[in-house]
Amino acid sequence: MILYKTSDLSYEIDSRTIFSNLDFEIASNEIYEIRGDNGSGKSSLLKILSGLNKMDNVYYDENLESNIAYLGHKNGFVEEISLRDNFNIIGAHVNDSLFKKFGLSKLKNHKFFNLSFGEKRKSALVRVIS
């Protein structure tokens, strides 16, 4: 089953061509790797595929839209408050089993700035999938 299909996909930022004339399909049950130098458009492509940047020539299975999340480079948490409070201020109600699954249960009441880089990334992942 084809999940995504692009046709002559091109993308520019500030009149600079990031990529052009991309034609590809992404099928279910396959693993893909996106590789390239810094600034080559990897994140831009993922933003397009996740729907953050809308493009006319990207076609996707409409059933996917509510199941797609994008975790960018920045965590987007308030450093001075607890992990739990960070989730509360955005209205995300995360059940304890998800915190436990990611090894964050004991850290819910810790200030975000005290978490390790990996714990912060796990927290960001929990936020996008909750």
Where are these regions (language model features)?
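Conserved structural motif at the start of ABC-family nucleotide-binding domains
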Residues: 4-6, 19-21
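The feature captures the beta-strand-to-loop junction immediately N-terminal to the Walker
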Residues: 35-37
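Helix-to-loop junction immediately C-terminal to a conserved catalytic motif
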Residues: 50
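Pre-Walker A (P-loop) beta-loop-beta motif of ABC nucleotide-binding domains
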Residues: 22-33
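Q-loop/switch helix immediately C-terminal to the Walker
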Residues: 74, 79-95
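ABC ATPase nucleotide-binding domain "signature" region
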Residues: 33, 120-128
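Conserved ABC ATPase signature
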Residues: 111-120
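Conserved ABC ATPase "signature" region
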Residues: 95-107
